[in-house]
Amino acid sequence: AVVRLKGEEVVCHVKNTGRCRELLVPGAPVFLEKSDNPNRKTQYDLIAVQKGNRLINMDSQIPNKVVEEWLLQGNLFGKDARVKREVSYGNSRFDLYIETEERKIFMEVKGVTLEENGVVRFPDAPTQRGVKHIKELCKCTKDGYEAYIMFVIQMEDVLYFEPNYATHPEFGNALSEAEKAGVHILAYTCQVRKDLINLAKPVRVYVNGKEESEEEQETVC
């Protein structure tokens, strides 16, 4: 991304693999982090962007760290839970592995930055890797593990989360099948400030899309 810094245009590395087209627009205020590596092609990393009243984290490495810290504080699985990063299962390596006296859990973490009118969606670009992870999580439930997908919404004050069927229907379909297979699907907002980021509040998840879910409810009634 090209950023105007102190009157000069500077090329910055964006620490996010998504498209981020709705965020990185001309004139958007951004936050940079200076690299201490003199051999890098770019001197700065673009780590956050302001969109309206929301400050949105752009560093794709942060969600895993935020969730790990949150779990180690005793959230979700208790204070005795042991948490490991990057543990392999089958043909995949999951972001987190959690173990308690009675439970063994794999968790995949996805950072969410795509927001429109308060609705947040994932992914913002097709992700076959994401589909593969979901299918592997379904397999591990058959071997006695618990499985979780945590969507970390890297902003505050949103309405609900749903898969981005318009961009990657296969991902949405895989997520829907995962829920049926017993995979737990969670979404949490983040409190994002200049000097911190924390998990904040749980958000309603519509794995089949909100409109589809409402139509199903009407049919049942």
What residue ranges belong to the model's regions?
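Short nucleic-acid-contacting surface segments enriched for D/E, G, S/T with interspersed K/R
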Residues: 17-31, 138
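Flexible glycine-rich surface loops and low-complexity tracts that mediate binding to linear polymers
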Residues: 25-37, 189-190
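A short acidic/basic microdomain associated with nuclease active sites
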Residues: 72-89
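Conserved catalytic cores of phosphodiester-cleaving nucleases, focusing on short active-site segments
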Residues: 94-124, 137
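Nucleic-acid nuclease catalytic cores
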Residues: 118-128, 138-167, 189
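Domain-level recognition of nuclease-like catalytic cores that cleave nucleotide substrates
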Residues: 155-221
